[in-house]
Amino acid sequence: GTASTIDEVAAKEATRKLLEELVSNAESIDEMEEILSNKFDESSSEDIIIQYFGYYIYEHLDKWFYEHLIKKNNQSDCNNLFRQIKDFIFESLKDTQRVNSLQNLDWGSDEADRLIKNIQQDILTVFE
């Protein structure tokens, strides 16, 4: 249904953004491979999971949310606001990670859905 399409779009965009963040400076496939290899050596997989799901949740914020914020703010304020929201999402996930491992979370489960909805609600509360 529509929810799985939204999930798929959000997942693809999260993957694209994470890869762009990790390897945007690579000038060849070999360099890309080296950067990724080094990244996985120096970062725990938890850091990468937090980045991925941070982008996923950011992409998952529904259209209403964006429209709601844009109506209340001008465009340049919105760009700054979206940057703050993204940081807020990453920090929320890091806090969650300290209590419950995100590695073991089934992102298709009700628990994950609650986590996403709670973060969205927190964003509305903090940024309205």
Segments and roles (model prediction):
Residues 19-27, 53, 57-61, 65, ...:
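Short alpha-helix boundary/capping elements
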Residues 37-56, 60-73:
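Extended amphipathic alpha-helical scaffold segments
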Residues 63-128:
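Alpha-helical oligomerization segments
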Residues 6, 10-14, 44, 48, ...:
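Alpha-helix boundary/N-cap detector
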Residues 1-52:
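Long amphipathic alpha-helical segments with strong coiled-coil/leucine-zipper propensity
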